[in-house]
Swiss-Prot record:
Sites where the protein binds Mn(2+) 1: 265, 343, 345
Cofactor-binding details, from the entry: Binds 2 manganese ions per subunit.
Organism: Nostoc sp. (strain PCC 7120 / SAG 25.82 / UTEX 2576)
Keyword Iron-sulfur annotated: no
Active site residues according to the UniProt entry: 272, 347
InterPro entries: Leucine_aapep/pepB, Macro_dom-like, Peptidase_M17_C, Peptidase_M17_leu_NH2_pept, Peptidase_M17_N
Reaction it catalyzes: Release of an N-terminal amino acid, Xaa-|-Yaa-, in which Xaa is preferably Leu, but may be other amino acids including Pro although not Arg or Lys, and Yaa may be Pro. Amino acid amides and methyl esters are also readily hydrolyzed, but rates on arylamides are exceedingly low; Release of an N-terminal amino acid, preferentially leucine, but not glutamic or aspartic acids
Residues at which Mn(2+) 2 binds: 260, 265, 284, 345
Alphabetized UniProt keyword annotations: Aminopeptidase, Cytoplasm, Hydrolase, Manganese, Metal-binding, Protease
Pfam families, sorted: Peptidase_M17, Peptidase_M17_N
Protein name listed in UniProt: Probable cytosol aminopeptidase
């Protein structure tokens, strides 16, 4: 799909499908819209009246028009109340238009949307993101794709002439989101630790990033006993991925994104039983997928920020070599961990990844992981949990969430809860009592960051959508890429 920019007035546009956005309870046709309705022989007013269209957010109505009108189809989309108008409103409204246009076999859509905050650049970028994310289709694993009908070929953004840079930025970010979606959606026999390392190498080759892949023996030399303990049972070699983007000159900040990378999680010897969703555990590398997606986007945008993209990637499998419940592992900072549940493995891999990252002398680290079901119980499917002792970093991430539309909610890091992780024979256990499980998981990770501002994002909910939700169809969402890119780009 091509996105074109036009300075053609709404009254002069002619083509296949015209899409117009209206605010809730402000659907009266005055000014330019009144003139357009007159030109269209009252079709707009008739559509609003007959369909009882009120402009509710993301609601749409559609009609075909007679041959004497300069457009063949009309879509009206609601923006909700004016006082609730956000940049995300445009993203979701554009997605709604794209879906209706595709369903109605529109080839070319002329899109008339208002500006958010009088900012044509941010508005154009958001619209382009919403359209592309909504219309993305993943048919890689279908021999005969179901969705092979008419596709939207071109969308013209009316009144956005000169915003080529905004569209280019949207394309760069969306390319990272789609990479993350593809990695998460692919089954575990398609995306393995080896595949993830090859993907990172391809990003480095395509965009000039530095890369280091630590093999098992390299990790052994660094004392990564927690990560390697999880990797013991797999027949596939673990891969510790470290991509680095460095700008020309002196960077204004040095940051790291660390993603959990379990390409499949069986639960280990504490195997996931019937009804546990074990068949969905290909998604347990959603953090690493977002990390690589962010790397792809950042490498194209080229900000004046040094960014490290790190993931310890392996499977959590079952074999005679597997770690046992009750084993004691030693992480690379010397801390010992009693494994009281082999299905709490993600935090073990992250422990060594965080120790490694903490030694790089950075300004801040953000890790993201499909870490706990407890976070999903607390916040549902749309919202990631934010855990950090650093108020400034929390504020940066909350602002990035607001701009990107990827929701987060700051959760407490109640230090008293660490009592539940104490072990009688090691420094700590890898799980605590059931209450506050997402908090104790974050407190566990906190033990492996000593010198750097740090935040943890538990993305177990929003990494996957069971049903259509805005610009996310059912399946992998690519959650985290846009949030992290906005964080990196923030001043």
């Amino acid at each position: 799909m091509a996105i074109q920019l036009s300075d053609k007035p709404l009254l002069e546009w002619a083509g296949d499908t015209l899409a117009i956005a209206l605010f809730e309870d402000a659907v009266e046709l005055t000014g330019e819209l009144g003139s357009l309705d007159e030109k269209f022989a009252g079709i707009l007013k008739e559509l609003i009246t007959e369909e009882e269209f009120t402009g509710k957010a993301n609601s749409t109505v559609f009609t075909r028009v007679s041959s004497n009108i300069p457009v063949r189809k009309i879509i009206l989309v609601g923006l909700g109340k004016t006082e609730a108008f956000k940049i995300e409103t445009l993203r979701r409204a554009a997605a709604a238009v794209g879906k209706v246009g595709k369903k109605q076999k529109s080839k070319v859509i002329g899109l008339s949307f208002p500006l958010w905050n009088n900012d044509p650049t941010a508005s154009a970028q958001a619209i382009a993101e919403g359209l592309q994310l909504a219309l993305y289709q993943d048919n890689r694993f279908k021999s005969d794709p179901e969705d092979k009908g008419s596709q939207v070929e071109t969308v013209e953004l009316l009144g956005f002439a000169g915003q080529e840079a905004a569209i280019n930025r949207a394309n760069q970010i969306v390319s990272g989101v789609i990479l993350a979606r593809q990695l998460v959606a692919a089954p575990a026999n398609s995306v393995t630790p080896i595949t993830m390392a090859e993907t990172a190498q391809q990003i480095a080759q395509d965009y000039g990033l530095q890369i280091e892949i630590l093999e098992q023996e390299d990790c052994e030399k660094l004392g990564m006993g927690a990560f390697l303990g999880v990797a013991l049972a797999s027949d596939l070699p673990p891969k510790f991925i470290h991509l680095t983007y460095k700008p020309e000159g002196t960077p204004k900040r040095k940051l790291a994104i660390v993603g959990k990378g379990l390409t499949f999680d069986s639960g280990g010897l504490n195997i996931k039983g019937a009804g546990s969703g074990i068949e969905t555990m290909k998604i347990d590398m959603g953090g690493a997928a977002a990390t690589l997606g962010a790397a792809k986007a950042i490498a194209q945008i080229k900000p004046n920020v040094e960014v490290h993209f790190i993931s310890a990637v392996t499977e959590n499998m079952i074999s005679g070599k597997a770690m046992h419940p009750g084993d004691i592992l030693t992480a690379s900072n010397g801390k010992t961990i009693e494994v009281n549940n082999t299905d709490a493995e993600g935090r073990l891999t992250l422990a060594d990844a965080l120790v490694y990252t903490d030694k790089l002398g950075l300004d801040a680290i953000v890790d993201l992981a499909t870490l706990t079901g407890a976070n999903v119980i607390a916040l549902g499917d749309d919202i990631a949990g934010l855990y950090t002792p650093d108020d400034a970093l929390a504020g940066q991430l909350e602002q990035a969430a607001s701009e990107s539309g990827e929701k987060i909610w700051r959760m407490p890091l109640e230090e008293k809860y660490f009592e539940g992780l104490k072990s009688g024979i090691a420094d700590m256990k890898n799980t605590g009592p059931r209450p506050g499980g997402s908090i104790t998981a974050a407190l566990f990770l906190k033990q492996f960051v000593k010198d750097t501002a740090w935040a943890h994002l538990d993305i177990a909910g929003p990494v996957w959508a069971d049903k259509e939700n805005g610009y996310n169809g059912p399946g992998a969402t690519g959650y985290g890429v846009r949030l992290l890119v906005d964080w990196v780009l923030s001043e």
